[in-house]
């Protein structure tokens, strides 16, 4: 399998950049479209926060991967405790796999283990830059991304990071992660195209909910819709009763109810909603990628609900190859590290001295990776080409495939 990651051609780009797709096609096709959208460890859908540590250890001995001329830092919490460390190791494995599957990569990864610590991430970035890194991949957590971004900006070196907190994105600090704003934009767009104009919403009362609520209000208004009722609820049955009842009372005046929550909580929310007289066969339920969870597929009242997420075909293929190589399942975020490494290897091979320039990285035609189309905006956030799926008792079914290309706006 080749890990060539093609840049999609754009008529607006200089001919050298338009040629990238053709050059990579001759080297071998890269997996496009993919992803399951399970959440980060199926955990609470808040922007990723790092483990608390009392003092900053020096960056761990991450080592190097590859022997190419172009050096790239890879900063991950490999030795962190709990899920953070599991994610860090899996992402390091995926990065190694990307280089192994790429056709003659001219890249060397300088792996820096930050143990989930902000100061260690900063020190690791400084070390990597002193060792000649031309780009930084990672870190995973928002505070560390901010710290690394400051170091990199002073040296005019770009960062491709993995945090889900869009607040840490900026010029030169690009987020490759799954941003909840993309899920919201896609599901509202599809619902509007299906004739849904009036909406209710039940939003979890956590940082993820704050981000999603703002995006939802903005996207509904942009498409000429109306939010009739919206409530925030805590993650306990007693506390959610009042907010759910308030939205249920407005159910006869809405076309759809948006509930962006995970399999840990969504079944209780929907059960409370139906107990208050809402017929979910008459009111369309909408969700985000957090719905990509077998626990949700088994809830009868959610059957027929729509949600936005990457098409899962590519992720399944990636996971199969990962299991064959490492004898264990990858975490969901592993594809981010794979795509980041495949991207820079492709750019090194095709883009010459401009390989990591802002113009190259923000190519409006975007790139195609394990999780489908993506592109970086100038402000550091990203846009992804997502599918819309329908919940069924046998799993999710794609009802609107991801786009084959991006429009001109970015």
Predicted feature descriptions by range:
Residues 2-23, 34-410:
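Extracytosolic ligand-binding ectodomains
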Residues 24-28:
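Hydrophobic helical h-region of N-terminal Sec-dependent signal peptides
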């Amino acid at each position: 399998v080749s890990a060539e990651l093609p840049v999609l051609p754009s008529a607006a780009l200089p001919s050298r950049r338009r040629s990238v797709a053709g050059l990579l096609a001759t080297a071998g096709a890269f997996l496009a479209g993919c992803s399951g959208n399970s959440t980060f460890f199926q955990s609470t859908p808040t922007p990723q926060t790092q483990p608390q540590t009392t003092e900053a250890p020096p960056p761990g001995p991450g080592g190097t991967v590859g022997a190419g001329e172009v050096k790239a830092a890879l900063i991950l919490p490999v030795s962190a405790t709990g899920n953070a460390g599991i994610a860090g190791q899996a992402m390091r494995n995926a990065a190694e796999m990307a280089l192994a599957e790429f056709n003659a990569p001219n890249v060397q990864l300088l792996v820096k283990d930050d143990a989930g610590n902000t100061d260690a991430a900063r020190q690791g970035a400084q070390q990597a830059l002193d060792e000649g890194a031309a780009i930084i991949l990672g870190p995973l957590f928002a505070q560390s991304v901010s710290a690394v971004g400051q170091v990199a900006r002073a040296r005019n070196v770009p960062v491709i990071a993995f945090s889900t907190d869009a607040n840490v994105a900026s010029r030169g600090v690009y987020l490759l992660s799954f941003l909840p704003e993309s899920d919201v934009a896609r599901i509202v767009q599809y619902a509007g195209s299906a004739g849904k104009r009036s909406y209710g919403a039940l939003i979890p009362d956590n940082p993820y909910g704050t981000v999603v609520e703002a995006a939802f209000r903005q996207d509904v208004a942009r498409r000429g819709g109306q939010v009739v009722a919206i409530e925030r609820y805590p993650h306990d049955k007693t506390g959610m009763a009042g907010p759910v009842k308030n939205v249920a009372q407005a159910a006869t005046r809405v076309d759809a109810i948006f509930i962006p929550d995970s399999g840990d909580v969504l079944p209780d929310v929907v059960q409370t909603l139906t107990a208050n007289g809402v017929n979910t066969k008459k009111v369309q339920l909408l969700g985000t990628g957090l719905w990509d969870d077998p626990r949700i597929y088994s809830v009868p009242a959610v059957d027929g609900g729509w949600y936005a997420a990457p098409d899962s075909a590519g992720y399944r293929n990636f996971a199969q190859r990962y299991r064959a190589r490492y004898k264990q399942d990858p975490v969901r975020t592993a594809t981010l590290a794979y795509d980041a490494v495949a991207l820079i290897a492709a750019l090194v091979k095709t883009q010459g001295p401009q390989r990591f320039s802002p113009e190259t990285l923000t190519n409006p035609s975007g790139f195609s990776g394990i999780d489908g189309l993506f592109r970086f905006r100038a402000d550091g956030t990203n846009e992804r080409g997502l599918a819309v799926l329908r919940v069924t008792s046998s799993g999710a079914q794609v009802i609107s495939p991801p786009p084959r290309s991006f429009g001109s706006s970015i």
